[in-house]
């Protein structure tokens, strides 16, 4: 049988490799002669070579020196901005004192300690007149029946389950609430925001006021959020205003057998030698809204947090900010759902604008393709602080 592994003393594998290399070279030459391919490569090279950092590197030393001076000015601007936000915090403290009498009256109406007058109860919505005209005849037909039913049933005191209803209405909060939390939250009578005193480090405290209940003895549960309003020395250009940097919860004095933040499990253990089995019980953490008062700490031991812990802490900061900025000032609108509808409409508007912008970008790309056909489309007995 003839041996085909050599041809004129040259191994056939080498001949095949040389042939493939020659074909590859020819194909490369053909591709590089394509104007569209060359244009695409040139565009990519241009994008790489014209980044801001590469441009700065090409500037003369005297220009770089002036840019450094501008950066120093920018740092000074950041410090002035920080001072601005400190004064805003002082204004918030001042106006919080003006709001508080209104919030105190709100609590009295909610708890039923005070009944609003007819003048205080008068309210006309935008559609109330139309609804009144359309429903007059129907209301007259059933008014006697309603009055009779009302006479039989005692009127509830205040506005039952006011704050608990807000928790249910707001997704950010309802996600934290477990079924066994609900009976406790029905005893929540008020939520207050207290700002740090003048001259003290910037912070605010959320106070959750409860009526006496069967679950814990604290009349008030607190959560303190510590804030910072100063540029980071290592990265001063990242400053965008005050930020929450840490938080403290409080110790809840649970009554015996009522702690919903832990659960008791039973576990069987078998003795290796004797083979006997015993049952032990131990407590393990349990999902609950009331874990909100035992937060992770962002500082203290000097160790960095893992990714999951950082996410948990960031979510906690967002919830605290939401209580302060939205829930407490506009509680009745979250109770009725009107504020939630406003929030949803605002989010939908943002998405619509984003879609329009994307459409404009696509249109610009199409125009470029027509001009250059070679271009390839491209957030009191108070409980003890921890």
Curated annotation (Swiss-Prot):
Belongs to the nucleosome assembly protein (NAP) family. It is found in: Nucleus; Cytoplasm. The modification Phosphothreonine is found at residues 51, 58. A motif (Nuclear localization signal) lies at residues 265-271. This is Nucleosome assembly protein 1-like 4. Residues 20-29 have a biased composition (Polar residues). Residues 339-370 have a biased composition (Acidic residues). It comes from Bos taurus. The modification Phosphoserine is found at residues 5, 7, 12, 49, 53-54, 125, 304. Interacts with core (H2A, H2B, H3, H4) and linker (H1) histones. It comes from the Eukaryota. The modification N6-acetyllysine is found at residues 105, 146. InterPro entries: NAP-like_sf, NAP_family. Acts as a histone chaperone in nucleosome assembly. Gene3D superfamilies: 1.20.5.1500, Nucleosome assembly protein. GO terms for biological process: nucleosome assembly. GO terms for cellular component: chromatin; cytoplasm; nucleus. The modification N-acetylalanine is found at residue 2. Residues 1-29, 339-386 are annotated as: Disordered. Keywords: Acetylation, Chaperone, Cytoplasm, Nucleus, Phosphoprotein.
């Amino acid at each position: 049988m003839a041996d085909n592994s050599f041809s004129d003393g040259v191994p056939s594998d080498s001949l095949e490799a040389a042939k493939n290399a020659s074909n590859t070279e020819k194909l490369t030459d053909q591709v590089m002669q394509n104007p569209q391919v060359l244009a695409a490569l040139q565009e990519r090279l241009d994008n790489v070579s014209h980044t801001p950092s590469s441009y700065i590197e090409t500037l003369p030393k005297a220009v770089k020196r002036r840019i450094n001076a501008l950066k120093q000015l920018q740092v000074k601007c950041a410090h002035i901005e920080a001072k601005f936000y400190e004064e805003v915090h002082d204004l918030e403290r001042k106006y919080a004192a003006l709001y508080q009498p209104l919030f105190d009256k709100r609590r009295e109406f909610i708890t039923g300690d005070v009944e609003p007058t007819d003048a205080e109860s008068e309210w006309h919505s935008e559609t109330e007149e139309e609804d009144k005209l359309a429903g007059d005849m129907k209301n007259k037909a059933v008014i006697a029946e309603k009055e009779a039913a009302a006479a039989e049933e005692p009127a509830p005191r205040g506005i039952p389950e006011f704050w608990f209803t807000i928790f249910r209405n707001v997704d950010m909060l309802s996600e934290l609430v477990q079924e066994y939390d609900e009976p406790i939250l029905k005893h929540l009578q008020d939520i207050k925001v207290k700002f740090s005193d003048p001259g003290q480090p910037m912070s605010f405290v959320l106070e959750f006021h409860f009526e006496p209940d069967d679950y814990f003895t604290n009349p008030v549960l607190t959560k303190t959020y510590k804030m910072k309003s100063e540029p980071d020395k290592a990265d001063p250009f990242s400053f965008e205003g005050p930020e929450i940097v840490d938080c403290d919860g409080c110790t809840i004095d649970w009554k015996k057998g009522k702690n919903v933040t832990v659960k008791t499990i039973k576990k069987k253990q078998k003795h290796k030698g004797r083979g006997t089995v015993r049952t032990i019980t131990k407590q393990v953490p349990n999902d609950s809204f009331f874990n909100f008062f035992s937060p992770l700490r962002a500082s203290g031991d000097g160790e960095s947090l893992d990714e999951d812990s950082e996410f948990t802490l960031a979510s906690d900061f967002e919830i605290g900010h939401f209580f302060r900025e939205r829930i407490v000032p506009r509680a009745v609108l979250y109770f009725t759902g009107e504020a939630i509808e406003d929030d949803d409409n605002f989010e939908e508007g943002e998405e619509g604008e984003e879609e329009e912008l994307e459409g404009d970008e696509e249109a610009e790309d199409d125009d470029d393709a027509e001009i250059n056909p070679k271009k390839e489309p491209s957030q009191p007995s108070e409980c003890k602080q921890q």
